[in-house]
Amino acid sequence: MATMEELQREINAHEGQLVIARQKVRDAEKQYEKDPDELNKRTLTDREGVAVSIQAKIDELKRQLADRIATGKNLGKEQDPTGVEPGDHLKERSMLSYGNVLDLNHLDIDEPTGQTADWLSIIVYLTSFVVPILLKALYMLTTRGRQTTKDNKGTRIRFKDDSSFEDVNGIRKPKHLYVSLPNAQSSMKAEEITPGRYRTAVCGLYPAQIKARQMISPVMSVIGFLALAKDWSDRIEQWLIEPCKLLPDTAAVSLLGGPATNRDYLRQRQVALGNMETKESKAIRQHAEAAGCSMIEDIESPSSIWVFAGAPDRCPPTCLFIAGIAELGAFFSILQDMRNTIMASKTVGTSEEKLRKKSSFYQSYLRRTQSMGIQLGQRIIVLFMVAWGKEAVDNFHLGDDMDPELRTLAQSLIDVKVKEISNQEPLKL
């Protein structure tokens, strides 16, 4: 007699056959609609018969499996009247009922979910592609990110583009870009590229190209990113020459012989980061430079703010040890939390429901970035917030409400029309 595992395997095999059989039926139906002759009719009838017989076999196997499960439950009850399952170490039954069996066979504990990515391997892989396919994939994972993830969740997708190809024995073959879209149970390899890792890497490698094409993630566009980025060179230069309250106000501190400035503070921060820079980080930058990537050198670079245009979930590894860059990303993540808090405050609901809508972009960014090897300079984030926080908030997109007078007029028209055609209470606009 077949075991339950064997029955389940047989059911799975037959279900695969059923999918193929149903596809053949659909193909035969299309052919019969095009050319309704006797041969096509007989083909359609035969294929429908095959699909019906496979379905009947599946139903029979499922019935056998259900009987086997029921028999096993009854045996368990007869063997132990206390209701304790065989193999359970308890002498008396727990107050809790038995739940699902969780299969751990697919897990690899040497590479647990959430481990630090192998950024060097990821950068080496990505720089083997031409820029057009990388930017198009970035667009699909930012502007169209939600739909792309929804349609392909739990799979490993391949991006293809005519610009990306390789020659194999003189034959031109497409070179696909692989990205994994994990679900909640997935365990990612260190070198595996997820949407978050992809955005992080590409944004750090090609900020100038992203700026030239104005490729801004919707997540960033709603927090006033463009307002801060449009005159970035002037804005950052103005900020750098401002007096810094975090340093002693003595002429000896400043390179220019005046009061200590924000530039002086970042200079000190850069020295500290230079001592912390890892071999992996140096290798990443060396490889990216050799590959011709347009990386930034410091926060004054014209495209430095564009490192965050694609909403990476941590500071890109190519600019992790550049003073002020990781903190600039943290500033944007706080703005995302601020906007979400404002939106939650607008919505109708209890305080508990609103609390559930609280955002944690900053905590996530902080945790991910610090796992890469640096501590964020919280004081620098404060300086950014004091300088640009109000301007950014004033440029938030908050789903602008209708003008009150216009809303009242539209609602009155709705009320009149609903009363004409129904005795129901009109809904609010």
Swiss-Prot record:
Location(s) in or outside the cell: Virion; Host cytoplasm, Host perinuclear region; Host Golgi apparatus, Host cis-Golgi network
Region described as Viral panhandle binding: 1-175
Short motif (YxxL): ranges: 178-181
Subunit field text: Homotrimer. Homomultimer. Homomultimerizes and binds to viral genomic RNA to form the nucleocapsid. Interacts with host MAP1LC3B; this interaction participates to the protection of Gn from virus-triggered autophagy. Interacts with host SNAP29; this interaction participates to the protection of glycoprotein N from virus-triggered autophagy. Interacts (via N-terminus) with host RPS19; this interaction probably mediates the loading of the 40S ribosomal subunit on viral capped mRNA during N-mediated translation initiation. Interacts with the viral RdRp. Interacts with host SUMO1.
Record bears the keyword NADP: no
Domain of life according to the entry: Viruses
GO MF terms, alphabetically ordered: endonuclease activity; RNA binding
Residues forming coiled coils: 4-31
Segments of this protein annotated with the region Interaction with host RPS19: 150-175
Assigned protein family: Belongs to the hantavirus nucleocapsid protein family.
Region (Viral RNA-binding): 175-217
Interaction with host UBE2I/UBC9: region residues: 188-191
Gene3D superfamilies recorded: 1.20.58.90
GO biological process, one term: symbiont-mediated suppression of host apoptosis
Protein name (Swiss-Prot/TrEMBL): Nucleoprotein
Region RdRP binding, residue ranges: 1-50
Native source species: Hantaan virus (strain 76-118) (Korean hemorrhagic fever virus)
Chief localization: virion
Effect of residue 191 to D: No effect on the interaction with host SUMO1 and UBE2I/UBC9
Enzyme class: hydrolase
Domain notes: The N-terminus is required for chaperone activity and, in trimeric form, this region likely serves in high affinity vRNA panhandle recognition. The N-terminus also contains a coiled coil region, which probably participates in but is insufficient to initiate N trimerization. The YxxL motif is indispensable for the interaction with host MAP1LC3B. The central region is involved in specific RNA-binding. Has distinct cap- and RNA-binding sites so it can bind simultaneously both the vRNA and mRNA cap.
EC number(s) stated in the UniProt entry for this protein: 3.1.-.-
Region (Interaction with glycoprotein N): 80-248
